């Protein structure tokens, strides 16, 4: 028997025993190269991720300091998933989910599946059961630091439980990974930062739960709080910086900058002005911003107010940015948000911008 026939026989036997799709040639189906995504709800982050959102069938880790915007990012992803008709689940190990804030960010809280487990084992088992059901599109676990092992909860204060949480995460992820891929579910772990003791050189910061999550994650996002945004003398929000420190589906190390406004969420208008000015979709001359030769505001705040009031122009600018920065996902596609038929968007790319920046 030739090698080719022996291989075909083996492939056929594997498919018969384990089911269709258990093994295949990478070029057998075009779909193998197309990754399903759930948009992040933030244009700059979709661009930084390289594929227009979070990849489905993968594990994502979002980590950062307290109050840096980690939970906000996951709630925005849940809102986008629900807008596409998907089902979302939130495993609230921290017991800190605010339904009012989630609703403010666009989450359909009435249809959001929520669990508040007592132990880390229970939380991960619930997540695994949801994934295996195949009926959930996104599962968020908030957070790894709050996944307390049962032995620690039942023990006394001060008892030593070295490496218990790390072993729990390692065991759970080995079990979860195959199920996540099979069901094409997006699973997001929120994680916190701790300081290593005795580190003299290099970064002393590390994440909780051991190293397993770092290895199993296809994408790792580091969230940092930037400067404050002021409305007069009052602080109305702060800048958020998200760095893609690991990416298995696109080039890593891209960064997304955007504004988080207290009581409102992510400022879409600020994103459009920053990205529009960077890629010459919006012209900037001194403090003035213009679109198609028409002045829209003096200074960023006035321009943001203009775009809030003029939604048609805002949607047109958004579409132009998406078509320029994510052409594979948005170019030549009909959309309810796109300008009316017959109108053309002319985009002039800044010649100083390299092709790498457009990815």
Curated annotation (Swiss-Prot):
A cellular-component GO term for this protein: cytosol
Residue ranges with Basic and acidic residues bias: 331-344
Single Gene Ontology BP annotation: DNA recombination
Family note: Belongs to the RecA family.
NCBIfam families from the UniProt entry: tigrfam_recA
Role description: Can catalyze the hydrolysis of ATP in the presence of single-stranded DNA, the ATP-dependent uptake of single-stranded DNA by duplex DNA, and the ATP-dependent hybridization of homologous single-stranded DNAs. It interacts with LexA causing its activation and leading to its autocatalytic cleavage.
Full protein name: Protein RecA
Upper taxonomic lineage: Bacteria, Pseudomonadati, Pseudomonadota, Gammaproteobacteria, Thiotrichales
Gene that encodes it: recA
